[in-house]
Amino acid sequence: GLWSKIKEAAKAAGKAALNAVTGLVNQGDQPS
């Protein structure tokens, strides 16, 4: 249903945000 689609979208958005934050932290910790 619609609610499950919303939950899936929220889960995907949260994962993407977490990956983005992790990437920024990794860049800060490991200057190239």
From Swiss-Prot:
Localization: Secreted
Lineage: superkingdom: Eukaryota
Biological process, per Gene Ontology: defense response to bacterium
InterPro entries for this protein: Dermaseptin_dom
Pfam family, one: DD_K
Species name: Agalychnis lemur
Entry comment describing in which tissues the protein is expressed: Expressed by the skin glands.
Keyword Nucleotide-binding: no
Keywords from the named record: Amphibian defense peptide, Antibiotic, Antimicrobial, Secreted
Protein name stated in the entry: Dermaseptin-L1
Summary of the function given for this chain in its UniProt record: Antimicrobial peptide active against the Gram-negative bacterium E.coli (MIC=8 uM) but inactive against the Gram-positive bacterium S.aureus. Also inhibits growth of zoospores of the chytrid fungus B.dendrobatidis at high concentrations (above 25 uM). Shows anticancer activities since it is cytolytic against HepG2 human hepatoma-derived cells (LC(50)=45 uM). Is only weakly hemolytic on human erythrocytes.
GO cellular component terms given for this protein: extracellular region
Family, similarity comment: Belongs to the frog skin active peptide (FSAP) family. Dermaseptin subfamily.
Record carries keyword Secreted: yes
